[in-house]
Regions:
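Generic marker of "main functional regions" within proteins
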Residues: 21-25, 29, 69-71, 94, ...
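Intrinsically disordered, low-complexity regulatory segments enriched in Ser/Thr/Pro
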Residues: 58-104
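Ampiphathic alpha-helical segments that act as solvent-exposed interaction surfaces
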Residues: 88-127
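Generic detector of leucine side chains in alpha-helical contexts
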Residues: 4, 14, 38, 57-59, ...
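Negatively charged, low-complexity tracts enriched in Asp/Glu with abundant Ser/Thr
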Residues: 1-58
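Generic serine detector
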Residues: 33-34, 48-50, 64-66, 73, ...
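A sequence-composition feature that detects small, non-aromatic residues
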Residues: 5, 9-12, 22, 47, ...
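Arginine residue identity/basic-tract feature
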Residues: 16, 41, 45, 51, ...
Length: 127
């Protein structure tokens, strides 16, 4: 079994350089061991270790049938679009869920979601 918190943080570090990331469960009583239904906050720090709260993300991982899906959004910024990643990426308005174009700073999030989903799909086949 993989440590999802480590996988998520490492993927965020790779795709959102030069920032460093930590993964915190949204609900204290939930762990980070299952991809069936996971909801975490990805906290961001700059190279000197200072918190970059406006760069923090929320990640939800869930299954739909046998498929793994991800929802990635900026924390406490409902006006920012959110990314759904299943077979393909879909950007949606954070306030109404309607489809929209990717934001100018969305490419690292798409890369992160794509890479993370590929790792989770690969791992779920091994389990």
């Amino acid at each position: 079994m993989i440590d999802l918190a480590v996988v998520i943080a490492h993927t965020a570090d790779l795709c959102r350089k030069p920032y460093q990331h930590a993964v915190i469960p949204i609900h204290e009583d939930e762990g980070t061991s299952s991809i069936d239904d996971l909801f975490v906050r990805i906290e961001t720090r700059d190279a000197s270790g200072s918190r970059m709260e406006d760069m923090d993300l929320e990640l939800e991982i869930y299954r739909s049938g046998s498929d793994v899906n991800l929802m990635l959004s900026w924390c406490d910024q409902a006006e920012r679009p959110m990314l759904w990643q299943g077979q393909h990426p879909v950007w949606m308005h954070g306030d109404n869920g309607m489809r929209c174009t990717a934001p100018a700073d969305g490419q690292p999030l798409e890369a992160m979601a794509r890479r993370l989903r590929a790792q989770l799909v690969s791992q779920s086949r091994l389990d």
